[in-house]
Amino acid sequence: ILVLDDALQSYNVYKNISIYVYDSIQSFGNRLLVPSGPLRESVKNAIRKSQIFFLINTEVCNDLNDSHFKHILKYKIEINPEFKEKKLIAFAGLGFNKKFFDQLKSENLNLVLTKEFPDHHQYTVDDIFLLLDQANKNDAFLITTEKDHVRIPDEFKSSVGIIHGEIVSDNNLGFTTEIEKYI
């Protein structure tokens, strides 16, 4: 089994199943395609090519009626209890960094600073030195996502805390059963 992220438009890869994930926080933006908007292809085409369609962040869904969706997904983060007692500097290189930072704020963490990097950023020694300098100046601890932590130079990994996250279905059995139909 091979799972690809952002591969809906990869026509040179044979797929047994395509799963379209709609994030109601990001929405469809202005509904225009790159470079004029956030979409890589029209919503209509993406839905037509997908066997499963998921909605995440349902609490802010304004664009769509959730009756169109087979399963509802939510992204949950797991906060180390030690982080709740510390001043924190969070950094991330995600497609939508603000969502990650907002989730941390909703957990009432003491964020003294957030630092955004481009999606899939490969952290350099200089990046981490600058972050550690900010942490020292603010008497704070660095935290980031699991996705970002693996891209930190090895010698700095122990200096950065990890925020674990997972996407969970409203019905894990249903989710698994639906995917198994195509395997």
Predicted regions and their residues:
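Conserved beta-strand/loop subsegment of P-loop NTPase cores
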Residues: S18-Y22, I47-N57, F69-K76, E82-F91, ...
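Phosphate/Mg2+-binding loops and adjacent switch elements
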Residues: I1-H68
